[in-house]
Amino acid sequence: EPSLFDTEHAAGSPPDQFSENGQNWGFPIYRWDVMSRNGFAWWRKRFESMADYFKAFRIDHILGFFRIWEIPVKHVSGLLGHFSPAIAMTEKEIKEYGFPFDARFCSLPLVHADDLKQIFGRYASEVCCRYLRPFDSDYYTLATKNFYQTDIAALDPTAVVGGEDTIRGLMRVATEVCFVIESGKPGAFHPRIHFEKSFRYAHLSLEEKKAWQRLSDDYFYKRNDDLWKQEALSRLIPLLSST
């Protein structure tokens, strides 16, 4: 039943000790809102069928009933995903934490001129001319607006100055955002996971870093707890009566 799946996003996981960029599993996410309209019939049928063969079974990745790490299909890295569902932040909220916010500056992938050499080595100047463009006097962004990680990954290494190293560098630049914008919701911002390990974070002032820590801690460890609890209960309780 294709209508039950969101093919514009892929499921994955945020970074952990095993994967610094997170994971992108490549398969679509469930459209729980659609599933709920007919009482989760698709899930009920699955459970009923399994009950014909097993007395008990374990649901793997049970956290998927609470929330999923969703990544737009135009991206590859788990760093560019966010929890779904999740209560996104507004510009007003972000500023209330004391973090200086400009939508374009915070959501576009930007790399400081001082970091180009570290990312691209001796090819920095050529890469900058071909694949980047100035954002302001200090920062560069990707050369074209719709130049996403999937486009970068599709580049032919033999046709790119610096080959695979340059492609990896461009993939890294694509993750250099402060906030991920929720698909279809221009004013809904999610803090980029592990932003503290980005090149951009190093250019923040001490006060800006403290503000980021406050909003990041709230978003990832407090803000969505009640939402996820209610989401899981609304899905799991009806399914427990399936068999």
Enumerate the language-model features and the residues they cover:
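Catalytic cores of glycan-processing enzymes that make or break glycosidic bonds
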Residues: 1-243
